[in-house]
From Swiss-Prot:
Repeat as UniProt keyword: no
Enzyme class: oxidoreductase
List of residues binding a plastoquinone: H215, F262
Note: 2 of the reaction center chlorophylls (ChlD1 and ChlD2) are entirely coordinated by water.
Record's subcellular location: Plastid, Chloroplast thylakoid membrane
Pfam families: Photo_RC (PF00124)
Protein name per UniProt: Photosystem II D2 protein
Positions with a binding annotation for Fe cation: H215, H269
Family to which the UniProt record says this protein belongs: Belongs to the reaction center PufL/M/PsbA/D family.
BP term (GO), one: photosynthetic electron transport in photosystem II
Organism: Pinus koraiensis
Residues noted as binding chlorophyll a ChlzD2 in the record, renumbered to the chain: H118
Length: 353
């Protein structure tokens, strides 16, 4: 008998292998390497938002009450942006503005940059989580690719737009009413609804809702009646391998309705992926354009020319009237650093706006 002496064929695990095994272990809530980014950032972003909406005022940045402590409700509470005078400062707690004073940091709007940056990295961590899990179970990464759409919208609206303007002040505050105020601002100062990138975004979102409704109804309509259960949910074994609905019947139905229909499940579902993701990406691209103050669709160029050239003619539409009304109504309070004062006769009155 021959005995071979030597090293074991199985090498000892390195520290990296040990950590990798622990992070990617099969457990109720998967952690993974992406979790090192996702969980801390999501925790801090949500914690900062709950803290800000509960306790922190916006008196020093916007002249507003914005917390539950001051009497706001879920609709009016917000984590408000820093003052315009702070420009694009990261407002670090230990930075020159707050100098380690937590109360001062909150008063200056430090929670907004805290929530925005941790929120952005949290969303990126969630997309990486989908990549990591897809790779580990040998799926294609289309979930992660689809999630790039809300990330693009968040980053363009909350980070790129204010970076193109004079400061974080012009980003949306984190609150329900604050987001609607920001939408009004976008319309009044950028004529956003007439922007073709916004139109593509609306087409994507509403088109996706239509596709989702049609798809869900069609699948329900064409379920095989081969179960004994009283309803859809009891008629099938949840782990059965066979199809539960008839693609052929669905194709025949829609061919009769429209004259055309999806005949391939892959193309159908890719289209349902493509429509909302592309629409959201187009909206994000449009917001980047607004960050740079591109003036193609907001009529400001026509208004300036009309003001400078008496012989210039322009259509004075209800759209222009709406935008001028929004600007007059919002500007004085929305941009307090400009010290704008409008005479009473030019401001909207009664129920005009």
């Amino acid at each position: 008998m021959t005995i071979t002496l030597g090293k074991s064929s199985k090498e000892e695990q390195t520290l990296f292998d040990t950590v990798d095994d622990w992070l990617r272990r099969d457990r109720f809530v998967f952690v993974g390497w992406s979790g090192l980014l996702l969980f801390p950032c999501a925790y801090f972003a949500l914690g900062g938002w709950f803290t800000g909406t509960t306790f922190v005022t916006s008196w020093y940045t916007h002249g507003l009450a914005s917390s539950y402590l001051e009497g706001c409700n879920f609709l009016t509470a917000a984590v408000s942006t820093p003052a315009n005078s702070l420009a694009h400062s990261l407002l670090l707690l230990w930075g020159p503005e707050a100098q380690g004073d937590f109360t001062r940091w909150c008063q200056l709007g430090g929670l907004w940059t805290f929530v925005a940056l941790h929120g952005a990295f949290g969303l990126i961590g969630f997309m990486l989580r989908q990549f990591e899990l897809a790779r580990s179970v040998q799926l294609r990464p289309y979930n992660a690719i689809a999630f790039s759409a809300p990330i693009a919208v968040f980053v363009s609206v909350f980070l790129i737009y204010p970076l193109g303007q004079s400061g974080w002040f012009f980003a949306p505050s984190f609150g329900v009413a604050a987001i609607f105020r920001f939408i009004l601002f976008f319309q009044g100062f950028h004529n956003w609804t007439l922007n073709p990138f916004h139109m593509m975004g609306v087409a994507g979102v509403l088109g996706a809702a239509l596709l989702c409704a049609i798809h869900g109804a069609t699948v329900e309509n064409t379920l095989f009646e081969d179960g004994d259960g009283a309803n859809t949910f009891r008629a099938f074994n949840p782990t059965q391998a066979e199809e539960t609905y008839s693609m052929v019947t669905a194709n025949r139905f829609w061919s009769q309705i429209f004259g055309v229909a999806f005949s391939n499940k892959r193309w159908l579902h890719f289209f349902m992926l493509f429509v909302p993701v592309t629409g959201s990406w187009m909206s994000a691209i449009g917001v980047v354009g607004l960050a740079l103050n591109l003036r193609a669709y907001d009529f400001v160029s026509q208004e300036i020319r009309a003001a400078e050239d008496p012989e210039s003619e322009t259509f004075y539409t209800k759209n222009i009237l709406l935008n001028e009304g929004i600007r007059a109504w919002m500007a004085a309070q929305d941009q307090p650093h400009e010290n704008l004062i409008f005479p009473e006769e030019v401001l909207p009155r009664g129920n005009a706006l």
